[in-house]
């Protein structure tokens, strides 16, 4: 685990408006021996709701209420407004350019222009709960293209169109912007890269290719 992910939960503790477990206590130490190993332990408030999915890619529709989508919107907006200098690999303008060029082999349209803000880069269906919304793991948040978290959640719901439509409607103010469209291309490219190593029974890769074609034309 990278150093940034290692302290992600602790560094997220002051962020108001994000639905997440509260950090109660944290301690770091090193094991004894000729090659000490760093160890961290955290105590968080209990989350009783289960993950919305057993996989990061949504296969079946979970129980999602209007309150759930309201809390999702509030969380995404609160995180976006929180300043950070946290950085993770891939999530910078230069790396995005390489990624999109390698994935799509064509220019990015003029209406897809990245802005940067604070995003959760692992906002997936296995990392959020239902029927009440909560992000379980706050390790991977950082500066990224604005809209990345929303884009990742939306695109990984495409196998369940009714839920994908709800996510898109709830987060349209982010997704339907120049940066939101760019974020969708980035998120789709990273998902496609992951799918080369994972089973794809619902043909998510094909759905992503079809969808990104609409963004690129």
Regions found by a protein language model. Name each.
Residues 1-52, 58-81:
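A conserved alpha-helical element in kinase catalytic cores
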Residues 11, 155-217:
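A conserved long alpha-helix in the C-terminal portion of kinase-like catalytic domains
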Residues 51-54, 99, 144:
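Short catalytic/ligand-binding loop motif for oxyanion handling, primarily in non-cytosolic enzymes
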Residues 65-68, 72-121:
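An alpha-helical support segment within catalytic cores of ATP-dependent transferases
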Residues 66-80, 125-129, 134-136, 186, ...:
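Short secondary-structure transition/capping segments
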Residues 72, 147-150, 182-185:
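Short runs of predominantly hydrophobic/aromatic residues within well-ordered alpha helices
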Residues 104-148:
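Active-site acidic catalytic loop and adjacent metal/ATP-binding pocket
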Residues 130-173:
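Active-site Asp-x-Gly
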